[in-house]
Amino acid sequence: MALEHAKSFKDLRVYKKAREVSQTVFRVSKTFPKEEMYSLTDQARRAARSVGAQIAEAWGKRRYEKHFVSKLTDADAEQMETQHWVGEALDCGYLSPADAAQLNSGLEEIGRMLNSMIEKADSFCGSPDYVLREDVLEYFTNAPTDD
C-alpha cells in the first residue's frame, strides 16, 4: 500500500481513528446513568474529543517540531485519560467488557500511531506545503506633488 502525503490533519489515519473512537465513546456514554452526566460522562466525552483536537492543533504547529511534538504528546495523554474513564465505566458496570475492549483497542492503536509520529516528527515538520502571504499593495498618500 502506497502512502500519500497528508494535505490536512483530516487526511491523517490517526485523526480519523480518534474521531471514530470519540463517536463510540459518545454513543456508549448515552446509556450511562443521569447522575454521571456531569462527572464520568462529561469527563470521558471531553477526553475522547480532545484527542482529535490535539492532533489538529499539532498539525497547525508542525512548522516548529517542538510544538508539534508537544501537541502530539498532549493527544497521547488525552487518549490515556480516555482509557482511564473507560476503565471507570467498566468498573461501575456502565460498559460491557466487549465495548471496553473495543474502545481500549482503538485507544491503544491511536497511542501507537501518535508515538510513531513523535519518533518521526522531522518528516512532518519544517516548511509547510503552503505559504500564506498578502499581495503587494501600493500605498499612496494625499501629499502634494512638486508639479
Descriptions of predicted regions:
Residues 1-147:
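Amphipathic alpha-helical assembly/interaction segments
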